[in-house]
């Protein structure tokens, strides 16, 4: 499936604030949650609904709810945690399935070190969240893991994506829809997205940077 770049004015504005070199941990963290919530709105527009009856103030009324099992949100640790609250603000009943993936800084290859999945994940839509889609290694490893667990419908949301990473994921898993706030220019020689956001994990957790 082709990657969807969501160019909503609010997303563009907030993403511009996140790109500031002098942004504080507090502001980056809040903006990551806000953009995560806006992307969630876009990524869930086609969820199936079912009708049921309730007692309203003036009698019986037909209302709608999301059909079937609710979503499981899959943050890729550690940076994916920074988007989690924004997603859960719209889907508070979602299960959370955490996946830990680390990237070798020399080879840029990803390996999985943690998986805590919802026990019925094979019956749920899995929504992967990670601020950055750079080389695509972490995303592919996570999707591989979810499919091995029996997950049949998977979507991914990232704040910023590199064309190289998109190509890797789309080639490995053409059935997975990716939603992003921005498709950036390229990867640099160190595997970082340009212009990107810097190290999103460090900015979310306040490590290796001066807090403004």
From Swiss-Prot:
InterPro entries: PRibTrfase_dom (IPR000836), PRTase-like (IPR029057), Upp_B (IPR034332), UPRTase/APRTase (IPR050054), Ura_phspho_trans (IPR005765). Binds 1 Mg(2+) ion per subunit. The magnesium is bound as Mg-PRPP. This is Uracil phosphoribosyltransferase. Its EC number is 2.4.2.9. PANTHER family: ADENINE PHOSPHORIBOSYLTRANSFERASE (PTHR32315), URACIL PHOSPHORIBOSYLTRANSFERASE, CHLOROPLASTIC (PTHR32315:SF4). It comes from Pseudomonas entomophila (strain L48). SUPFAM superfamilies: PRTase-like (SSF53271). Its cofactor is Mg(2+). One of its GO terms (biological process) is UMP salvage. Keywords: Allosteric enzyme, Glycosyltransferase, GTP-binding, Magnesium, Nucleotide-binding, Transferase. GO terms for molecular function: GTP binding; magnesium ion binding; uracil phosphoribosyltransferase activity. It catalyses: UMP + diphosphate = 5-phospho-alpha-D-ribose 1-diphosphate + uracil. Uracil binds at residues 193, 198-200. It comes from the Bacteria. Allosterically activated by GTP. Pathway: Pyrimidine metabolism; UMP biosynthesis via salvage pathway; UMP from uracil: step 1/1. Catalyzes the conversion of uracil and 5-phospho-alpha-D-ribose 1-diphosphate (PRPP) to UMP and diphosphate. 5-phospho-alpha-D-ribose 1-diphosphate binds at residues 78, 103, 130-138, 199. Belongs to the UPRTase family. It is an enzyme of class 2 (transferase).
